[in-house]
């Protein structure tokens, strides 16, 4: 990450999470541990990265990661290379975010649910003595918008085909027409989301929809 920060002249941001998709683990030959183990790994990893990014030397003795007076040279270009934590688990992920994150990104949540999770993060910040304003708050939303009513109908078919009944509680998607997408942007803004990250899943992509998004929805983000 430090090398990328230098290549980009101080624009790198590091994003991590506890992991959730077993096929991704299997594809690279890693075992897929239980949720507790993955949350333990995330907490230790976040602490290790925070130390490496911000301290001359890093020392951590954990179950999964150990650093002994480890340097990170050259130092990042940024005074503080941003560490983002993604996820919405209230007991562990949000607690880890409150401890170490410069930014928190929640995946595929509707505005009301995102607001509730954001309030949980605030409570963890208060309990741990962290300034809530030190953590940027964003939401990851799926893109299933059409440029017009016909395009929206096609996008809805794709949404149902890709997610169907197995949505894992996810409800945060840009669906329908640009007008409806703009309304959703306003709803997220109203509950405190600072940015929206647009998730484009497997193609082929609807370029008319993307152009309509750029022309009609992006202005609502600024």
Predicted features along the sequence, with ranges:
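Active-site-adjacent structural elements that line small-molecule/cofactor binding pockets in enzymes
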Residues: 1-222
């Amino acid at each position: 990450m430090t090398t990328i920060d230098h290549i980009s002249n101080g624009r790198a941001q590091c994003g991590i999470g506890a992991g959730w998709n077993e096929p991704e683990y299997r594809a690279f030959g890693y075992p897929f541990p239980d949720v507790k183990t993955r949350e333990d790994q995330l907490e230790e990893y976040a602490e290790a990265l925070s130390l490496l990014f911000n301290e001359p030397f890093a020392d951590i003795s954990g179950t999964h990661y150990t650093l002994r007076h480890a340097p990170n040279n050259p130092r990042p270009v940024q005074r503080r290379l941003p560490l983002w934590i993604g996820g919405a688990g209230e007991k562990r992920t949000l607690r880890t975010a409150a401890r170490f994150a410069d930014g928190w990104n929640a995946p595929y949540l509707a505005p009301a649910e995102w607001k509730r999770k954001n309030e949980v993060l605030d409570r963890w910040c208060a309990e741990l003595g962290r300034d809530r304003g030190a953590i940027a708050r964003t939401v990851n939303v799926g893109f299933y918008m059409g440029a017009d009513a016909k395009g929206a109908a096609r996008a809805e078919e794709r949404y149902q085909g890709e997610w169907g009944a197995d949505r894992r509680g996810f409800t945060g998607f840009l669906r329908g027409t640009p007008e409806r997408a703009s309304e959703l942007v306003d709803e997220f803004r109203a509950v405190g989301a600072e940015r929206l990250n647009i998730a484009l899943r497997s193609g082929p992509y609807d370029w008319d929809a993307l152009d309509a998004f750029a022309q009609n929805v992006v202005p609502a983000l600024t």
